[in-house]
């Protein structure tokens, strides 16, 4: 991710085709060592591609990924299908919560 961020920073600054040396210079300016193998792979993957198109394509792919309630609904449906097996697990969680609340011995750090 750090390599991609440096590459995009260079592209936004006007360098239309940043080299691995350019990316290394950006990373070293903030004290980060570049991973040569990953950097070369990134440069090879992005070579000749329009960054704006890649960003737009990535945004549409991210928009199609379910998040929030949809991800939580699937496990809930699976738990409802299991029936009685979910009830003991819920009781165990409640017991654990009580034990954790006793650990502060009545002194709330952020009360």
From Swiss-Prot:
Q: What family does the Swiss-Prot or TrEMBL record give for this protein?
A: Belongs to the eukaryotic ribosomal protein P1/P2 family.
Record organism = Aspergillus fumigatus (strain ATCC MYA-4609 / CBS 101355 / FGSC A1100 / Af293)
Q: Name one Pfam family in it.
A: Ribosomal_60s
Cellular component terms (Gene Ontology): cytosolic large ribosomal subunit
- Segments for region (Disordered): 81-111
The record's function comment reads:
Plays an important role in the elongation step of protein synthesis.
Q: How does it assemble?
A: P1 and P2 exist as dimers at the large ribosomal subunit.
Q: Which GO terms describe its biological process?
A: cytoplasmic translational elongation
Q: Which keywords fit this entry according to its UniProt record? A: Allergen, Phosphoprotein, Ribonucleoprotein, Ribosomal protein
Residues where Phosphoserine occurs?
101
Name by which UniProt lists this protein: Large ribosomal subunit protein P2
- Please, which domain of life does this record's source organism belong to? Eukaryota
Q: Which GO terms describe its molecular function?
A: structural constituent of ribosome
């Amino acid at each position: 991710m750090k390599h991609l961020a440096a590459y995009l920073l260079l592209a936004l600054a006007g360098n239309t085709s940043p080299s691995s040396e350019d990316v290394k210079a950006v990373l070293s300016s903030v004290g980060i060592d570049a991973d040569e193998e990953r950097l070369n792979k990134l440069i090879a993957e992005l070579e000749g591609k329009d960054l704006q198109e890649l960003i737009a394509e990535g945004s549409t792919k991210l928009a199609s990924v379910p998040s929030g309630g949809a991800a939580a609904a699937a496990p809930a449906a699976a738990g409802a299908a299991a029936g009685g097996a979910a009830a003991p697990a819920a009781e165990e969680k409640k017991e654990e919560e009580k034990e954790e609340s006793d650990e502060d011995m009545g002194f709330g750090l952020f009360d």
